[in-house]
Structure formats: C-alpha cells, structure tokens
Amino acid sequence: MLLSAIASQTLLSSNPNLHFSNSIPNPRPSNPSLKLLNASSSSSSSSSSSIFTRGLRYVNHTVSNEESEPGGGETMVASASAIASAIRGASTTPVEFTQMIEKDHLKTKIILPSPDFQRLCLEQLDLFRQIVDPNAVLSIYVRPAGSYVMDRLELRRVTCYPSVNAGDVVILVGNFGIPAGLRAAEASLSSQQVELVSKHRAAVFPMVKHPFVVGFLVAELPVEAEEEEEEEEEEKPHGVNQFLSPEEAYALPASANTKSPRVKLPSVKVFTEEQRSYAINISRTLAMAYVMDQKTMLLQQSSWQNNVRMSKLVEQIRGPLSTMRTLSKMLSTHTKRNQISHDIVEDLIVQGDQIKDTLEELQDAVHLTKANIVRHNEEALKKINKTHNETRRSKYEHKDPIDGSQISSTRLSLGSGLDDSEMPMPPLALAPLQMHSIRPCDISNVLLDMVETVRPLALTQQRVVELGENSASLQVAVEEPALRQALSNLIEGALLRTHVGGKVEILSTRAPAGGSLVVIDDDGPDMRYMTQMHSLTPFGAELLSENMVEDNMTWNFVAGLTVAREILESYGCVIRVISPRSSDAALGAGGTRVELWLPAFPAAVSEANEA
C-alpha cells in the first residue's frame, strides 16, 4: 500500500516573536521541504504492481523579504538572520534575537542616517555589484547612536539594494546572556574582515570604526550554476527504469533501489582575493562615512539643544539684571555717598548671586557648542600661556570663594573622606516635570548595582571604579530604566576617558536645596585636551590618522552626555559639566566632573520635612 505524505514547509524564523539563541546546530537543515518526485500510477492498477518511490530530497528554501507563512506570520528577513548567525558564532555567551519591521518610520519617529549617507550607500552597493557579483542582494545595517553604551545590540536596516520595500525599516535586537557578552562579541567581530554564512548563502562584512562595530554589510549571493545543474539533474524523472515488474520487485531487497536521503547544504561563492579586497574596502568606506554622518547629526542636535537652553538662560539673566539696574538708579537718586540702605545692598547681593549661577549654567551650555569645539584647535592651545591662566585663576579664587566652579582640587576630590567638604552650588529650580505615573527609585541602590556590574570590566581594563562610602539612600522622581540608561552613558564615558591605571569616583548625596546630587569624577583628559584634535569637525582630515584615541574619546563623551541629558532633562533634572575639575593639574590632565541634580519624589520630600 502506498502512503502519500505532504510535508508543509515551515520556516524556523516565521514567528516574528521567536527568539534565537546559541544552540548546537542541527546537521540537517532546520526547515527542509520534503518533496516526493513524480511517481504517478493509475488508480486502476492492480495490487501486484508495486511502485518504489525515490528518496526524499532536502530543499533549502530562501526566504525573500516579503514572504510570509500561509497563516499570515512574517518571516525573519534573510539578511537579518545571516547577521544573527554571524554574531552567534562570534559570541561566547547565549544571544537572543528579535526582529521588528516598521512600515512607516516617519510616524514612529525613528531616527535614520541622513539622505546624503543613504545616497552614498546606494553608490557603494552598486559598485559592489559591478566588481564582486552583479546578482548579489545587498543590505546595510547600522547601529543607532544611543546603542553603543547599552548591554544589547540594536541594528537597523537603512538600505537594501536592489530595493525591496525600501520604506520598511528592519530592526534587529540582540540580547546577550551577560552584560559583558556584547563587548566580547564586538571585539571578536572587529578582528574579522568577513564572515561567510553558508546556511543563508551570505557574506557578512562588519563595518568597524575602532573600537566599535558600527554596522554590517550583508551580501546575499545567488546559487552557483553547478548547484542549479545538480538540482535539475536530480529532479529529472528516470522513466521506465523507475517501474519494476512484480518478479523483479520481489526478487530484490527492499533497499536495493532506494537511495538514502541526501542532505545538501548551500555553499557560498568563493571570492577571489581581488574581489575580497574590494568588498572589505567598501565596508570600511561605509563605516567611516556613517561615523562622520552621525557626528554631523550629533552636532546639529547638540547645537539645537544648546540654543534652546541658552535662550532660557538669557531670559533668567534678564530679570535680575533689570532689577539691579533699577536698584542702582534708586541708590544714585535717593542716597548720598555715605548713606546706602542696607536692604538695597542685600538685594544687590542676592541678584548678583542669581546672575552668577545663571552664568555658570550658560558657560556649561556654551562649552559643548560646535563653534567652541572648532575654535579650540591645536594651534590655539599651543599659544595658551599656562602661567597667565593659572595667575588669573588664582585671583578669581581669592575674590569669589563661593563660586562652585572654582573649588580647589582638595575640595573637588571625592576620596578625601572629609564630611565638611563644600557642596557645589545648586541650580535655580529643581522640580519633577512629570508628576503623574512616575515610579520613584532609590538612587543609591541603582548606583551600587551599576558599580558592581561595571567593576569587573574596569578591572580587566586596569581601571578602578569606586562608590563613595557616604552615599545616601534617596528616592528620586525618575523612572529606574531611564536613570540606568543615563548613568550607564556617563559612567562608561568616564571609563573611556581615563587612561590605564585611572580612577572613576561616584558619590550620591542629598542636595542642599532638596533632591539628590550625583557626582561622577574621572582623572582622564579634560575638555581642553579632548577638543584640540578637531574631533567633532565634520569630514575632518584627522579622521584618517592612525592615532584615533582622542577622536573616539571625545565622540563617546559628547554622545553619552547628549543621550543622558536628553533623558534626564525630561524628568526635570539638571546636568553640569566641570572640565577641568582640578585647577592645579597639568595642562590637559585636569579630569572631568559631571554633576547630576535629580528632583526628589514629593512623598520623600514630605517625609524628610516631617522628620
């Protein structure tokens, strides 16, 4: 009796919510399509005639970008699946991948690279097809700017050539089993020039801008002509020899004419040395172009944010300045030389203090503008008279001892252990902006957890991370996930700025005017040193130099600070940057201090007042 079975084609990645993890690969394809070749017989044939079917052949099914299951579930994009396989191969820890497809990125407000970069991608991919393979399907995946300091890997497909649903944005997110798994996989991928994924018949080129992997170039290669001929030969029917007489059928063993199933894995086209070199150079060109594009967009965003912030600070200065002018006119009109009212003098002092505080914030805002960074180039720094600056700074310290930005190095040190150290000046206003649906968190618990997590990684890099002993347990009006993301940006930026043997100190305490104060100090280069390389100048010539430590340092500092500021300011927090933090340090080695002023949760404030 002949049993007919039709095996439905089921794709492993057809479920968009399916998580991929590191597992031992099955030697047989995970999604075979079982086909019974033509073995037709009439329905009226007698039971004495027996038909021997041929062996089952495994057919690898290549999924197109638009293909889906009959049930309606979306399949995983082939290029994304190839990247996932390459990352799993480079990772020493389990990795789970999820895929999302945004049909309209304008409504979801997903930030994509500039149109200039996307046009450059199309030109480079067209060059790839001309030189390497004219039938290759090429895709470019890049990492968004805010993902470099996270424990997960996020990739977005920005270009697919030839275009297949060009308006769709494919987002691939990889979650690593341990926080350090991403860094280890990134280091392994950075050392590889190309990864061949036979399962998907693709070549994955990491786009590396040391020390980061900024994206991937995926080339899905066509089937070789020899493979097509073999498949056609296997699919040809064998005609009369396929049907045996009853005597022959009973005379032969059952396995005599039955071929065992053969597993044929797809092969990847072998590049010539010249094609391989061209492909690697194209991936490097795209990596460098993406870095410059991100820096340009970061500068535009930072400049816009600083312009908004500066306009608000100017309005804050205008009120006290008008009051001071009015009081000055009153003094000149109603008093004689030796008859100055004490109340008027006190008002002048208060208004002067407000202007001083606002000017400090204005200085911090101006410190990171594009014009300021470009202005502090290498030639200008060489002309700085160090002795003159130190003399002028010492005069300011004696004249205005309550200026928080001019505190001496002993007061700025968090490791001194002095309980009576002078506190920085608080901001003018510190209140939560989102009163509703905020779940408060304990800042000390968050800092303790993050320091314990980052400490092993810092030790492997020969750096030290310390949390102040007198860190207070305080409730702040900031969501814990947002606070963790902002702090991870700032702490990792501080670690990247320090040299081997460097130190990062973190302290949290109660702010003088309410709320919490978190101080992050590092002993790395200060902003005067980090801005001397034209590091944020778009299309700067220094990007082609070999020693790019300062460039990466500044890029991560500004990127991390921008991300943290955008997150925390939405909760009413204030971020201040003091660089150099040590006035008596050598030129360029003054370190950086980052102050985070976090508003307290209203319930915590009322409990503190009752106590």
From Swiss-Prot:
Gene name in the database record: CSK
EC number(s) reported in the record: 2.7.10.2
Function: Sensor kinase that senses the plastoquinone (PQ) redox state involved in stoichiometry adjustment of both photosystems (e.g. long-term adaptation via transcriptional regulation of reaction center genes of photosystems I and II) and state transitions (e.g. short-term adaptation involving reversible post-translational phosphorylation of light-harvesting complex II, LHC II), thus linking photosynthesis with gene expression in chloroplasts. Autophosphorylates, probably on a tyrosine residue. Probably phosphorylates SIGA/SIG1 in response to plastoquinone redox state modification.
Keywords recorded for this protein, A-Z: 3Fe-4S, Chloroplast, Coiled coil, Iron, Iron-sulfur, Kinase, Metal-binding, Phosphoprotein, Plastid, Transferase, Transit peptide
UniProt region (Disordered), positions on chain: 17-50, 385-420
Subcellular location: Plastid, Chloroplast stroma
Binding residues for [3Fe-4S] cluster: 121
Entry's cofactor comment: The 3Fe-4S cluster is redox-responsive, binds 1 cluster per monomer.
Post-translational modification: Autophosphorylated, possibly on tyrosine residues, in photosystem I (PS I) light and in the presence of manganese ions Mn(2+), to a lesser degree, in the presence of calcium ions Ca(2+), but not in the presence of magnesium ions Mg(2+). Dithiothreitol (DTT) stimulates autophosphorylation. Phosphorylated on Ser-188 in vivo after exposure to far-red light (when plastoquinone (PQ) is oxidized). Not phosphorylated under orange light (reduces PQ).
GO cellular component: chloroplast; chloroplast stroma
Coiled coil: 345-380
Gene disruption phenotype: Abnormal regulation of psaA gene expression by light variation and reduced plastoquinone (PQ) pool. Accentuated superimposition effect of light leading to PQ oxidation. Increased level of non-photochemical quenching, faster pre-steady state kinetics of the 'Kautsky' transient. Up-regulation of chloroplast-encoded photosystem and non-photosystem genes.
Family membership: Belongs to the chloroplast sensor kinase protein family.
Organism: Arabidopsis thaliana
Catalyzed reaction equations: L-tyrosyl-[protein] + ATP = O-phospho-L-tyrosyl-[protein] + ADP + H(+)
GAF: region residues: 116-300
Cofactor dependency: [3Fe-4S] cluster
Record flagged with keyword Ligase: no
Residues bearing PTM Phosphoserine: 188
Transit peptide, residue positions per record: 1-79
Major localization listed first in the record, in broad terms: plastid
Residue ranges of every copy of the Histidine kinase domain listed in the record: 312-602
Protein name: Chloroplast sensor kinase, chloroplastic
Any GO molecular function: metal ion binding
Biased composition annotated in UniProt, kind: Basic and acidic residues: 385-402
PANTHER family to which the protein is assigned, alphabetical: CHLOROPLAST SENSOR KINASE, CHLOROPLASTIC
GO biological process, one term: detection of redox state
InterPro entries: Chloroplast_Sensor_Kinase, HATPase_C_sf
